[in-house]
Amino acid sequence: MLTGALLLLLLVVIVYLLDKKPSGLPPGIWGWPLVGRMPSRSKHLADQVKQLRKKYGDIITWRIGTRVNVFLCNFKLVKTALSKFECSDRPDFYTFKLFGEGNDVGVVFSNGVMWQTHRRFILRQLRDLGMGKSRLEAAIQHEAACLVQELKKHTDQPMPLPKSINLAVLNVIWKLVADHRYSLQDQEGQYFTQLLTTTTDNMQGFALNLFNYLPWLLMITPDFVKNWMGVRVLRDGVCELKDYMKTFIKEHQATLDPSNPKDLLDAYLIDLQERKEDPLSTMNIETVRAVIMDLFGAGTETTSTMIRWTILYLMKYPEVQAKIQREIDAAVPRGTLPSLEHKDKLAYFEATIHEVHRIVSLVPLGVSHYTNQDTELAGYRLPKGTVVMSHLECCHRDPSYWEKPNEFYPEHFLDDQGKFVKREHLVNFSVGRRVCVGESLARMELFVFLSAILQNFTFSAPKGEVLHTEKDPQQMLFSFPKPYQVIIRERE
């Protein structure tokens, strides 16, 4: 009896010591031992943090499960933190690790030498392959022209936006990665885009994300329960994506000409050959596959989703859509697709794209960062292993920086003469050391695709259709628009 009581007391003391809140953290919620304070499922996490901001201020601690999270709710804090080396890692989240089969590979979720090596390599190769240059613009314009022809088959009837939009965006990434494209009617291409969408969506599941914040659950949860929570579905999707990558890698290995690399995959395979005797090299087939998957995941779903958001807002604000079309008509001759050369003459259109980015905040809490050592921020101490979350929506709706923070107002990005102006406080591609490697490509795609679409079509809501622009509380990472119906009308 006494022994049992002593063991219980010892357990209580151990839990207390392990659960003790580190000194110097920002104010906020600590919660219970082992479980912290879990967020509500009925409200988006970003909205729950906004409520906490009213009580605790712009820098907030919230222990979710056993993870110490620090949320940053203004631009200066976000810029300062994400520029620090100490805050440049990604957390070892379970959902992140599933993409690398438990390994620290790729470029989006990796850290240290792995991340630095592949980020530099990708930026150099994409620059050489034409990111931001006319060579790549021609490929995007070809996809835009094909998309215009495809959309003509879907006019004058209520329907969801065609999936061919996703495939057109995907083809741009395929061109860069493997010098490949699908017809917009191709069943395999459409299946691949749907697989990307489904896998990204599955990654956001609330139940599955419990393992990110309660890692001890992995040790006690039976496999059948894990599968019910979404592990098998996500893992199967990742494996299927990897199988696609394997096929193209094998084809490129068979046709590789080291003197004439035609795409990113060739460049990787050549570099892999050159470093095969280097024991410190991070280049191997598994890593190449992971990096290519990162490019598809980050470069396809985000851009196609922003096209869908933009069309939704232009349906909701038809006067903005009409003004853009008048601007395009005045700058671009009919029968000629808009190009980057017309950018200076399409200031209102450019401003509208940026305003959709601002009002939507596609990744409301940014992609999680992680402290790789103890550091200080705004007078507070962030211990090693702290998850750092950037509340980009707070940055994008801060009345200190935006004239009409809660309204859709393209004039946020226009000066007094009606010319487009960049705003430093728009951080939709993040900021600091891990700013998105594909920012230039994404901006080019959005400009070319949307200008071509709006030059040729008008989008309106069917009678009685309610257009929802609020976030889905079940989505932990991205903010996808709710499904909507649209009527596409060809312009004369």
From Swiss-Prot:
Its main location: endoplasmic reticulum. One of its GO terms (molecular function) is oxidoreductase activity, acting on paired donors, with incorporation or reduction of molecular oxygen, reduced flavin or flavoprotein as one donor, and incorporation of one atom of oxygen. CDD domains: CYP15A1-like (cd20651). It catalyses: an organic molecule + reduced [NADPH--hemoprotein reductase] + O2 = an alcohol + oxidized [NADPH--hemoprotein reductase] + H2O + H(+). It is an enzyme of class 1 (oxidoreductase). It is a peripheral membrane protein. Efficient in catalyzing the monooxygenation of benzphetamine, aminopyrine, benzo(a)pyrene, progesterone, and testosterone. Its cofactor is heme. GO terms for biological process: organic acid metabolic process; xenobiotic metabolic process. PANTHER family: CYTOCHROME P450 306A1, CYTOCHROME P450 508A4-RELATED. It comes from the Eukaryota. One of its GO terms (cellular component) is endoplasmic reticulum membrane. This is Cytochrome P450 2L1. The gene is CYP2L1. It comes from Panulirus argus. The keyword Membrane applies. Heme binds at residue 436.
